[in-house]
Amino acid sequence: MKPAIQYWLSLASPWAWLGSSRFIGLAGRSGATVEVLPVDLGAVFAATGGTDFRRRSPARQGYRQLELARWSKRLGIPITLEPRHYPVDREPASRLVIAARMQGVDVLPLTHAILGAIWHEERDIADWATVREIASACGYASSASGPFYC
């Protein structure tokens, strides 16, 4: 029996971006099937007493930036610490990932591209045109005639 992984993540998480390549490699080496499940961390924080990063103290915000920079350097993965389009509405990208997953499409490359669009390329994943461009660049159809529609 193949291992199965439920991969819960925010499609706007800088930590998900930094771990994405390694996660994809791990899943590939293990032969695991991966179910990508986008989650709204803002809603999770609100329900569990967590604090959105924008409402954290300046000291905590600074430490977050420091740790992101450290991990970026350690992993050799470029990251823009303050991208133009962040915070960003994740709904269009999340809907795309969910729709593609429901059609049986391997969405790990798409998920990686969405994360990179924010944290490396500074693109706006709240914009449907951008999301369709990302899908197309990953080889996914983004019209009603394709495997999923967005």
Describe these PLM feature segments:
Residues M1-Q6:
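Extreme N-terminal starter segment of soluble prokaryotic enzymes
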